[in-house]
Amino acid sequence: MGIKGLTKFIADAAPNAIKEIKIESLMGRIIAIDASMSLYQFIIAIRDSEQYGNLTNESGETTSHISGLMSRSIRLMENGLKPIYVFDGAPPELKGSELEKRGEKRQKAEELLKKAKEEGNLEEIKKQSGRTVRVTRKQNEEAKKLLTLMGIPIIEAPCEAESQCAFLTKYNLAHATATEDADALVFGTKILIRNLNANATSNQNKNKNNSKRGYILTEINLEQVLKGLNLTMDEFIDFCILCGCDYCDTIKGIGSKTAYNLIKEYNCIEKIIENIDQNKYQVPSNFRFQEARKSFINPNVLPKEDIKIDWNEPQIEELKHFLIKDYNFNELRVTNYINRLLKARKVTTQRRLDNFFTACTKKSTKLIVEETKKEQTLPARKGKKRPTAGDKNKQKAVKRKIEQANANGHHKMKEENKSVDNEKNEDGIKSVDNEKNEDGIKSVDDEKNLDDEKNLDDEKNKDDEKKSLDNFSSNLFDSDKESESGNIIKNEKQNMDDEKINDNLPSLFGDHSRIRHTENKDNISDINNNNNNNNNNSSSNNNNISNNHFNSVSSNSTFNSSTKLKSEDTLKSNSPLKEDSPNSYNNIKNNNHTININSQINNHKEPISNNNLNNINNSTEIKKKNTLFLLPFCPKDVTNVKKKKYTQRC
């Protein structure tokens, strides 16, 4: 009987828990079927469409349960289902009173059936015949033998078949329970399937006659029921007991709605009994709700270790003998069933798409260690190992990580270089400013020092020239002290000193200075010729001058002629001007000495003529030019001078 009004109440209070399904959605699923309920359906439902009579053999025995069970099983297997039939065992003690009530109802139904047959009322015959139907033990044994020959597994429950089916789903040995009794939900089945009969096929929605509730394949999900009703499993069990079950009587006046409200308010039957109005709700004296609760929570079922589910090959010859000889089935019909059975078994071996998308579980460390040991013990194969798809993916992942790391490192290096460049620029600006300030101070000091040194050098050169002239004149006019040879030696020493001074001068003169040197040499040579002529004239005219004076003049004339030759030779030679410059300077200086000496002699002995004055003036101008040009400022130690950004002017 199950729970009174439970399916209707769930449809109203928790509609998301019930849904219509197609049989194709159960492909590849193991379905635990209540065999006693199926046999009952076959006995009352498989009838002739016109007479509603049971199928019988020659001796009058009913064979509808055999025909119906075989045809339904083959149809389920053709749709990809894997049925497991569970048979009832001994009924529980709590169900004794319920069985007595069912016996009394069956007797009344038999009496009504006789009257309907006498009257010929077909509708009443159909109605009362269903109430009088009872599945016998013999029918159960015949069904077990048929399923075994077909190779379909069966389970004999120690007690209720619904409770055993529910625990198969808990053990994950079955996907759902197929029965019409709603008490399978109270036993804890995860999914309950109703109306899994011969008419519940994939074409059920196309047939108008199948719009009736009894022919619609429905599925009830226990988890969604509890969620929709907002109850715990213990509260749901107490709620079902109050609604009415096979194990105890019910409280009069309490239906499914009242029971639900009381459970939501008091959470258990004990508190409900304490708080309800006893005058309004009569509690039965033998209300064994606690025992009923225990039978739902801990039913008598087979443990998981004792359950054996074996899919065997069908026994064709034995099956033919059982159907044809024992129960007088048509041979053609039997061969048709057997052929369908063999084809259906191939369909059940197909896997669901869900199995191809299951979540991958991680291996334990023990398994990984064992696998690595096995790999190490295996001998290495010859040849190169081809990279698998997983290896390629790993290599790509490693490359991506390396590229990301390089990109991040390059970005960091750029940022560090930028910071370093900024610091360098700041330090460089500071250092440049400091260097500029220091260079400015040093350049000012160097310019001052250079000017001072220039002035000192000019003064020294002037003093040296004066001293040389004075010494030379004294040597000329003091005949008692020095001889001609002494004068010549002194002049040679002075020339040597001048050459040393000129050698120390750096080669800082450009092309223009070299040209000026050559021009001055030409002018000086002409002047020397004139001076020599004048000196000869003066020597011939003056007879009162002593021999020493003439000797000195002659020596000077020879010296002047030698200097003239030197200057001409330097002009003709192609030697570098660096080597000629000191000689030219000495020649110019010696010529100047002779000019001064001759001028002094002329001033001392006789009046100066116009030619002599012109020569003297020319020599003084040349002397000024030479001193201005030949004695520029230049630092003594060129190596110690720092390199400047600008060129130093001489």
UniProtKB/Swiss-Prot annotation:
Description of activity control: Inhibited by monovalent metal ions.
Subunit structure as annotated in this protein's UniProt entry: Interacts with PCNA1 and PCNA2. Three molecules of FEN1 bind to one PCNA trimer with each molecule binding to one PCNA monomer. PCNA stimulates the nuclease activity without altering cleavage specificity.
Residues spanning the membrane: none
GO cellular component, one term: nucleoplasm
Keyword hit for Oxidoreductase: no
Key word Kinase present: no
Organism, as annotated: Plasmodium falciparum
Binding site for Mg(2+) 2: 181, 183, 246
Annotated residues for binding of Mg(2+) 1: 34, 88, 160, 162
Segments of skewed composition (Low complexity): 525-562, 582-592
EC number: 3.1.-.-
Protein name (Swiss-Prot/TrEMBL): Flap endonuclease 1
Biological process per Gene Ontology, one example term: base-excision repair
Enzyme type, top EC level: hydrolase
Family annotation (Pfam families): XPG_I, XPG_N
Segments for region (N-domain): 1-106
Post-translational modifications reported in the UniProt record: Phosphorylated. Phosphorylation upon DNA damage induces relocalization to the nuclear plasma.
Cofactor(s) in the UniProt record: Mg(2+)
Domain of life: Eukaryota
Similarity remark: Belongs to the XPG/RAD2 endonuclease family. FEN1 subfamily.
Region (I-domain), start-end ranges: 124-266
